[in-house]
Amino acid sequence: EVIKIEPLYGELARTLPLQREGRSGYFVQHNIGKKTMAIDISSKEGQDICHGLIKQADVVVENFAPGVMKHNNLDWETLKAINPDLIMCSISCFGQDGPLANLPGFDWIGQSYAGIIDLLGKKDDTPIFGDFAFGDVATGAHAYGAIVTALMHRMRGGSGQHIDISLIEVLFSFHELSVQLFDSTGGQMLPTRAGPDHYLLAGAGIFKCQDRYLFIVGLNQWLGLTRAMG
């Protein structure tokens, strides 16, 4: 059972287009199967309701800016005193501590700080951002893996724990080539935007054909690729 806590006026996503039969398709897509409760967590009554739910909860997931949960008596120290076996996962842009922790942020902000957007687009043109929230999605997947691991730890006799997941750490891990190339060459090799091509690998890119675009990766199949091309 998953219970989503929303403000009294409802989550903003409920208003997003497109609407069908009075419901947002976006909201339904991301919340299907969840139960919802509208609670004013800034009030004593609302906090008491949340504390009651915590007593029987296995997992709490929150994505407020760091400090908001503590301000509303819903921080880890408070909740683990109520339920020592609780698994709590806090998701934020920059993590729960550090020099950027108090800054708010969302997917595209995280992509910018992590250097993702700087590598998207044509070499001498403006960087671009994709119309996909892959930072949000990937961070959710990382959180899922961490939560399941924490639950397994608890099943084997461990205690509850607080998990800190940040968008910027997840997005930075996307640099499967960039970071190690820069580091191993002493900064001599700088990843660059390359448009439809790859800045390092030959035989990988997007090519315009007669009726559509074709993406080719022929790294270990170069001879086969050239034969297929005639």
How should each PLM-predicted stretch be described?
Residues 113-230:
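Acidic, glycine-rich segments within the central catalytic cores of soluble metabolic enzymes
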